[in-house]
Amino acid sequence: MTNVVVSGEQLQEAFREVAAIVDSTVAITAGPRGKTVGINKPYGAPEITKDGYKVMKGIKPEKPLNAAIASIFAQSCSQCNDKVGDGTTTCSILTSNMIMEASKSIAAGNDRVGIKNGIQKAKDVILKEIASMSRTISLEKIDEVAQVAIISANGDKDIGNSIADSVKKVGKEGVITVEESKGSKELEVELTTGMQFDRGYLSPYFITNNEKMIVELDNPYLLITEKKLNIIQPLLPVLEAIVKSGKPLVIIAEDIEGEALSTLVINKLRGGLKVAAVKAPGFGDRRKEMLEDIATLTGAKYVIKDELGIKMEDLTLDDLGTAKNVKITKDNTTVVSENSDSDSVKARIEQIKSQIETSTSDYDKEKLRERLAKLSGGVAVLKVGGATEVEVKERRDRVEDALHATRAAIEEGIVPGGGVALLYASSVLDKLKGASDEEQIGINIIKKVLSAPIRRLVKNAGLESAVIIDYLIKQNDKELIYNVEAMNYANAFTAGVIDPAKVVRIAFETAVSVASVLITTESMIVDVPSKENASSPMGAGEMSGMGGF
């Protein structure tokens, strides 16, 4: 491989090409009347999806320069997906339109730094306006919760109602997970007991699902300790017993490092041991209490610590905890238990309640209530089924999107949906003036781009957007939307066409961040096949003039 430097108008043209591909491929999935996209796989049948994030990841242009730019777009979707798990299609629409508009201005000779400064200035004003438009959502208003989920699930009422019902059952601190069902029933909810804490896997090598970048272990044993583990020798007897049992192992410890961590990773990669390790949640005395909670929930005999005088070498499988399944992301661990009705769990709950009553510290009471909610709130498992694997995967994508959107709505409230929140927010830019002509161009770009999501939603429904947008603006009612599913104008909250404010905010913030980076990029260094590689689709003649880009 060799590389070349691409800059100037050739780079700007590549930016516009990729932005146009994204706008025409990812954007067609937007809204209830959006279309599905087929993504070819190296093996098996193509995946049919309406998930904008998956479509964006599937775009791999043949030209090396375009492929590099597409990967940056995909990274923006990934950031949005990681933060809220939804809004990736909106983020793609905003990013691609910002790039196309800014690239035209740069090609006309305008200063790119000034344009970026104007975009950043407009961003700050728009974020404040989105926050002011937000309306708090209550768990008691189950219809509002359901509507958020229904919209994110592309109008599927069964998904929306199931998620709303799950939220109501487990509460704000409860956990909701999604898994594929072996049956043909489209969607069912199973309520069980478990908890989630904010610690992720200690090494990405523990990952079992590379597509979602998570660890999923069924029926694992749990070894819970307050100790730091840095040598493997004391663990060998229990690890050998685990291997013989054929079950996975999850280790929760103060820390795992050095030889202990590397040995676990090597054995996992070789297939000899299904294992994952996470750090214990919390700090100090609170960490000790949370480990005791986990031990009680999983039926472990004890948390292994120096005070007990128990040696690691003497552990047996009977001393360990068990769970129905454990899911670990880079940030969180979810334990679904089969030990929920045990006397020890009930006694632990009563003990925490008693501590809440006797505590004189508001801070301590708050933390105790969090522990109580985690221990007693439960876990709702949404089981997704279908007639074929393709159907199951497509439905699971929509369920997960809807679940993420619902969580975001509970956190930061809701705003009118259907793309109007950004459209109406753009009106505050009328009074914003840039310090230079280029800054004003940047502000004007944001003002124009903020109408892109609603334009795309209406276009996907086969309608003319200009007439609808003009009518909405003239009515001067920030709760008025155009419902592309019912094909009529309506109040957003009455019609249930609403979006989580957090999803709208993150999608816009991320789009501005990525667009700002690309706008100020003057050159890109791109790897291309060497001239000697005759089999390359890009011959030597193309390389010398860089026509293969």
Curated annotation (Swiss-Prot):
InterPro entries: Chaperonin_Cpn60_CS (IPR018370), Cpn60/GroEL (IPR001844), Cpn60/GroEL/TCP-1 (IPR002423), GroEL-like_apical_dom_sf (IPR027409), GROEL-like_equatorial_sf (IPR027413), TCP-1-like_intermed_sf (IPR027410). GO terms for cellular component: cytoplasm. Keywords: ATP-binding, Chaperone, Cytoplasm, Isomerase, Nucleotide-binding. CDD domains: GroEL. GO terms for biological process: protein refolding. It catalyses: ATP + H2O + a folded polypeptide = ADP + phosphate + an unfolded polypeptide. Belongs to the chaperonin (HSP60) family. Forms a cylinder of 14 subunits composed of two heptameric rings stacked back-to-back. Interacts with the co-chaperonin GroES. This is Chaperonin GroEL. It comes from Wolbachia sp. subsp. Drosophila simulans (strain wRi). Its EC number is 5.6.1.7. The lineage of its organism: Bacteria, Pseudomonadati, Pseudomonadota, Alphaproteobacteria, Rickettsiales.
